[in-house]
């Protein structure tokens, strides 16, 4: 077994990488543990969502894809919009350094400005490009956000049932995942349960609407009451340590 890492190709870095690989291989041969046990355990656990997805692939091979309705991972079953396909084709014509090169860490300035303009036009906000930080997927965004607004030992509230990866990202930031049960009849966010879950260690509350996995769309009244509760809680706290509201919105555009 070998370990490879992404390093600039200087003699010092190459030597360091080779030494690290040799040390790892030596320890591996001796049966020594060289990896994070907590993360290994999480990776070794079976994911029911992935199991269902794999089962769906098997059934498609057996009886035909048109006879299987797979609701596991949420893969699209329709073609991409024409505008998306055309944009991808156009991107392939960019100069090589733009197509394959690195972007600034927060993302391309023109892309950030376009996102800010879209949000302002649709939601009446007043963002600027500098307020937008681009990531590859929501997982990276939530990981960065949690690392930015929490400290080890803090607590982060999630609305149960919730997307399982929230717990992984929260605990990886050194925080405790605290569950606030949704309304059992409507799956609406229960403001009362969120209020009960708030402690001196609460650093953030994560919500997503439409919700994964329930599909519930939080009402304006529910969100307004949640905002008021958090404002009241923050009024009693140190102004430098407010409870942050993190809104995960991968399904914002999918409301039926």
Question: Where on the chain are the PLM-derived regions?
Answer:
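Walker B catalytic acidic pair
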Residues: 249
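N-terminal small-domain helix-loop-helix segment of the aminotransferase-like
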Residues: 35, 39-137, 144
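Residue-level marker for buried hydrophobic side chains located in beta-strands
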Residues: 245-246
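Conserved core of the PLP fold type I
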Residues: 96-240, 252-254
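Short hydrophobic transmembrane-like helices used for membrane targeting/insertion
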Residues: 1-3, 12-14
């Amino acid at each position: 077994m070998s370990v490879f890492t992404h390093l600039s190709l200087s003699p010092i870095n190459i030597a360091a990488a080779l030494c690290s690989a040799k040390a790892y291989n030596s320890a591996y041969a001796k049966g020594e543990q060289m990896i994070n046990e907590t993360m290994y355990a999480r990776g070794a656990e079976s994911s029911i969502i992935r199991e269902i997805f794999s089962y769906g692939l098997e059934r498609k091979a057996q009886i035909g894809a048109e006879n299987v309705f797979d609701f596991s991972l949420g893969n699209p079953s329709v073609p991409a919009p024409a505008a998306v396909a055309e944009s991808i084709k156009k991107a392939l014509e960019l100069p090589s350094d733009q197509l394959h090169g690195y972007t600034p860490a927060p993302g391309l300035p023109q892309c950030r400005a376009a996102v800010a303009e879209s949000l302002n036009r649709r939601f009446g906000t007043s963002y600027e490009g500098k307020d937008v930080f681009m990531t590859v997927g929501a997982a990276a965004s939530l990981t960065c956000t949690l690392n930015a607004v929490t400290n080890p030992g803090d607590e982060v509230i999630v609305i149960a049932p919730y997307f399982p990866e929230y717990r992984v990202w929260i605990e990886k930031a050194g925080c405790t995942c605290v569950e606030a049960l949704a309304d059992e009849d409507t799956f609406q966010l229960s403001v009362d349960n969120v209020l009960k879950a708030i402690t001196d260690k609460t650093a953030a509350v994560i919500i997503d609407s439409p919700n994964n996995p329930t599909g519930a769309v939080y009402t304006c009244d529910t969100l307004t009451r949640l905002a008021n509760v958090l404002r009241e809680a923050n009024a009693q706290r140190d102004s430098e340590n407010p409870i942050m509201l993190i809104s995960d919105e991968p399904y914002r555009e999918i409301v039926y």
